From Swiss-Prot:
Gene3D superfamilies in the cross-refs: Nucleoid-associated protein YbaB-like domain
Keyword flag ATP-binding: no
InterPro entries xrefs: YbaB-like_sf, YbaB/EbfC
Subunit structure as annotated in this protein's UniProt entry: Homodimer.
GO molecular function, one term: DNA binding
Descriptive protein name: Nucleoid-associated protein GOX0603
Amino acid sequence: MKNLAGLMKQASQMQAKMEAAQSNLASLIVDGSAGAGLVTVKLTGKGEMRDLKIDPQLADPSDIETLQDLIVAAYTDAKTKAEAASSEAMRDVTGGLDLPAGLKLPF
């Protein structure tokens, strides 16, 4: 029974750490950019877009495809950084235990 009580205590501590990690990730802002900074995106650590800036020189109606590509590239850059921050936060919570690829708990 002592082991069960210890496990319950550990589970409770891990839950508190996960909640703190989620809160930290929600307030973390990561920047992504493309086109030498002509397009920038800001995402939360949970991947929610908060800002998109486009340099006015890219507003060329005859070349909208380049603008679209740069927006996607900037978003992808920021998303990669947000996922890295999330993975790092989870490693801190799990004590370095690597979770299986694709497992995105609790996010």
